[in-house]
Amino acid sequence: MNQDIDTKIESKIHEDLSPTRNLTGLHLKIVAAIAIIWSLFQLWYASPFPFWFNIGMFKGLPARAIHLGFALLLAFLIFPFSKSKKISIVDILISIIGTFCCLYIYFFYDQLVDRGGILLKINISENFILPIELIIGICGILILLEATRRVIGKPLVIIAVCFLLFSYFGQYAPEMISHGGLSLKRLVGFQWFDQEAIFGIPIGVSVDFIFLFVLFGALLETAGGGKYFLDLAFAMVGK
């Protein structure tokens, strides 16, 4: 009896201290479905099938954008804004917007390349021009920072914000590290629509290698492979 009570107390403490939501029911099924689709995409991208069938081939930047889109979608569904464990409409909305900002790169990649870094503007009327890609880039950067805060914590967000401010206000930095400063358009264009910033080498390595290692490691652990190798090691040393 006391053991059952202790187990329930430990479970409650873990639930309260865990940064993630305890998903159940429909929410759990949705998150699981997204994770499965993400895994299938990564397996397809890493396989030779796209080249064999000449279909579903992804270039570097679009593949990285899709990868980050899945990550943002799951981040806001799994990690809550506060101690509340329920998924709010705001979390769902932010996750959809963040995913859209990433998928925009995939759907309009050729146009982005043709414009050579010039962000698209839409003429709404004679007196109003909507900087659509500037807005998408700003939203994507802000949502990524919020996702980073939820998953990892504030320190990395603070470092990223400091470098963004340094890029924009570089002319006010000490002379040894000062530079001309980037305009908001150039900053957003480089950070969000280029393959050298947010979608640079780290995400490239994640797309090509890290995700697959984590996926197959999780499958191996679930299938009992971890216990098998431990038992094998103990058997080899005679314990």
Residue positions per predicted region:
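Membrane-interface loop-to-helix entry segments
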Residues: 89-97, 128, 142-170
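Membrane-embedded alpha-helical segments and adjacent helix-loop junctions characteristic
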Residues: 141, 158, 169-239
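Perimembrane helix-loop junctions in membrane proteins
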Residues: 46-49, 53, 109-112, 116, ...
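Hydrophobic membrane-targeting signal helices
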Residues: 40-45, 107-108, 144, 165-169, ...
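Conserved, well-structured core domains of diverse proteins
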Residues: 1-128, 133-138
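C-terminal ends of transmembrane helices
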Residues: 75-85, 144-149, 222-227
